[in-house]
Amino acid sequence: MSEERLIVEGKVNGKDAYFLLDSGASVGFLNKDKKKEYGLSEGRRFEGTIIGAGGEMRNVMHCDTFVHFGGKVIPQFLLADISGVVKSIKKETGIEILGIISLPQMSMIGLNLDINSLEVWLE
């Protein structure tokens, strides 16, 4: 956990990784640049349009890889170039994230946030 951001540690294909918890995100992402290192499974092309703080994202793919966190399995990630976010968070916190966990994903696994104290717990 970071004192600046809601960052948690999880596992992907047995490897430890860090994730930003983003209550404003409607979809979760895994960093396309780490596809080989983490064995991220690329599925079909995502047909929708993704627009985030950094602008429109192109070449977004469905990702058939799951994140394991606190004994729970988190599905439904997209594989995209999130290098701008990764660099920004690393500069701010010293932590390199692999991905972003969205609000619907948090809800799916019963993850709760206390924004004021930066505490995270599972139901």
Locate each region found by the language model.
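Pepsin/retropepsin-fold aspartyl endopeptidases
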Residues: 1-123
